Amino acid sequence: MIEPNLRGNGKVALVTGAARGIGLGISAWLIAEGWQVVLADNDRERGARVAEALGEHAWFVAMDVAQEGQVAMSVAEVLGQFGRLDGLVCNAAIANPRNTPLEALSLGEWTRTLAVNLTGPMLLAKYCTPYLRAHNGAIVNIASTRAHQSEPDSEAYAASKGGLLALTHALAASLGPDIRVNALSPGWIDTREAAEREAAPLTELDHDQHLVGRVGTVEDVASLVAWLLSEDAGFVTGQEFLVDGGMTRKMIYLD
């Protein structure tokens, strides 16, 4: 449940990959806290639809984060519309080719994954920095616990998220003290819509893999993102926060 407050107080945040899942959850939470939120996504139809559903404090901009020209143009649109930028959440990512064996992994698939998941956040930081600096803003990069542990055939995704953690502390060093930069690494987060969850509910075994006894929700991620963007986190930068219910700290033995 979102606890309403005015921590955002009219500030402006840009959230990428915001048309669904974690990005949509972050956007909704920030709006509830009083932020103006720009939802960026390469899915124009869905992005415009969800922005309209979120109400007057949501605004949509189409963007492929791996295309420098689109990033530059979209950031300029945001500034033209709002005149300021206080927060950047780099959430857009692709997992493919997550289950492609290394022998079958094409260079194009590898390159596209790193372009979206790693180059994208760099480009966004590059073009947003002058405006974030003017308001002592903050950046939150959405990484993954896959930067620390892997399943087979996940080379591209794991490498991109590991790189994003390194980019995070490099940006924190380069952009401080004016801009704070942190990373948040989700574990298993149930991003499915209500109908999907009802049709295929999670099992007791799914929940038991976590020390807290349940799979995560988008609100678990969104609430921490909101704190990291706020002045309450003013002494926090260059850090990674794992939001995984303790899953990466639990030893599991299969019978």
UniProtKB/Swiss-Prot annotation:
Gene3D superfamilies for the chain: NAD(P)-binding Rossmann-like Domain
Give any GO molecular function from the UniProt entry. oxidoreductase activity
Query: What organism is the protein native to?
Result: Pseudomonas aeruginosa (strain ATCC 15692 / DSM 22644 / CIP 104116 / JCM 14847 / LMG 12228 / 1C / PRS 101 / PAO1)
The protein's name in its UniProt record: Uncharacterized oxidoreductase PA3106
Q: Which PROSITE patterns match?
A: ADH_SHORT
UniProt binding sites for NADP(+): 15-39
* Enzyme Commission code: 1.-.-.-
Under Pfam families, the record lists: adh_short_C2
- Family indicated by similarity: Belongs to the short-chain dehydrogenases/reductases (SDR) family.
NCBIfam families named in the record: PRK05717.1
Q: Which SUPFAM superfamilies match?
A: NAD(P)-binding Rossmann-fold domains
What UniProt keywords are attached to this protein's entry? Answer: NADP, Oxidoreductase
Q: Catalytic positions?
A: Y157
Give the organism's phylogenetic lineage: Bacteria, Pseudomonadati, Pseudomonadota, Gammaproteobacteria, Pseudomonadales
Q: What positions does the entry give for substrate binding?
A: S144
